[in-house]
Amino acid sequence: MVPGVDEDAYGTRKRLAFASALISAARPRNVLDFGCGTGLQLTMPLAARWPEVRFLGVDADATSIEFAKTHCTAPNLSFALAAPPREGERYDLIIASEVIEHLEAPGAFLRDLESRLEPGGRVLLTVPNGYGPFELASLAYDALRAAGIVPLARSIKRALFGAASARAPDTHAFSPHVNFFSLDELRRGIASAGMKVADFRPRTVLCGFGFDYLIRGRRLNAWNAALADRLPPQVAS
């Protein structure tokens, strides 16, 4: 486990533990975090835990990368706005966490990741369930926003939980989901890119608008993460 990151409704600590366990088993020399955002929730904690591994975080959002560079202290970690050239360095591990659901051409992106791997390299991919509770909560949020109710909901949240209840920003970009994958669709897309699924782990069940206010505290967050391991993967977020 990597210390310093609390669990939340999104399974942030569970994701970090999975990534750390993968690094422990695979012992990569270098890691590319494609779509790293601010780096706060994954790239930076991993680089701090594994100082012998070189990490590069890249993202298309300039504000997120500037934030990451400002807050980066690990000598084995760097950030860049543009992806490295395809003919450049190959990587033992590539992370693409919460990325392909935002892309117009996810298949091409997965093939690009595969082309950047060293022989025997691995990709760590995290993707929301396109038909799970999170996406349903997002639909409810969009409906409330269209009705002009979201500002009221935020005011109620601040009154109940305080301004400090927000999660640390994983990105400063606004990028809506344009893809909604089922697990079977995701497996087929991975296979079409010339890769295979070696391991799979659901993160949580209840997250997103509304659930963020209800699933709070260590016990509830731990229960939410454990629940995802006990239910069919189609139910997880």
Where are these regions (language model features)?
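Short catalytic micro-motifs in class I SAM-dependent methyltransferases
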Residues: 98-102
